[in-house]
Regions:
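A short, N-terminal "cap"/entry segment at the start of jelly-roll beta-barrel domains
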Residues: 1-50, 65
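Conserved short histidine dyad/triad with adjacent acidic residue
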Residues: 36-43, 54-70, 104
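Short strand-connecting beta-turns/loops that link adjacent beta-strands
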Residues: 46, 71, 115-116
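A short hydrophobic beta-strand segment most commonly corresponding to one strand
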Residues: 55-56, 101, 116-129
Length: 129
């Protein structure tokens, strides 16, 4: 593969992220599963084909849909805000600067009951099962 690296410019992400008025509009609709996901790297962009990287923003009063993956490890690094990670039914408070590791298998989700957006960087790595 000829790719050595790829730069994702932060100004491009900021332009896509939107503002708090989006979260307010969504809260009026009553569905609390709201977040923006920005894909920084898909598996096909890596040499191994096993790495996926992104940034997620969970708006105040909202949550992610939640998911499980039996063939991937996942690491979250929290950039801004506070929230609650739930994995396998166990809740953990998280804040900017925290790192959270999810083993393959358990259902996990992120909730933001606070008044500021929760932003985190995440990476999944496919493992041999």
């Amino acid at each position: 593969m000829d790719k050595i690296g790829k730069i994702i410019k932060s100004e491009d992400l900021q332009a896509l992220a939107g503002g708090s008025s989006f979260a307010a509009l969504l809260r009026e609709e009553g569905d609390q599963i709201r977040r923006d996901v920005f894909m920084l790297m898909n598996p096909e962009d890596s040499v191994s084909g096993r790495i996926q990287v992104g940034i997620t923003i969970v708006y105040p009063g909202c949550t992610t849909k939640g998911h499980t993956h039996g063939d991937r490890e996942e690491v979250y690094y929290f950039l801004n805000g506070r929230g609650i990670m739930t994995a396998d039914g166990q809740e953990t408070e998280v804040k900017a600067g925290d790192t959270y590791y999810v083993t393959p298998g358990p259902y996990h989700t992120t909730r933001n009951p606070y008044d500021k957006p929760l932003e985190f960087f995440w990476i999944t790595i496919k493992i041999e099962v």
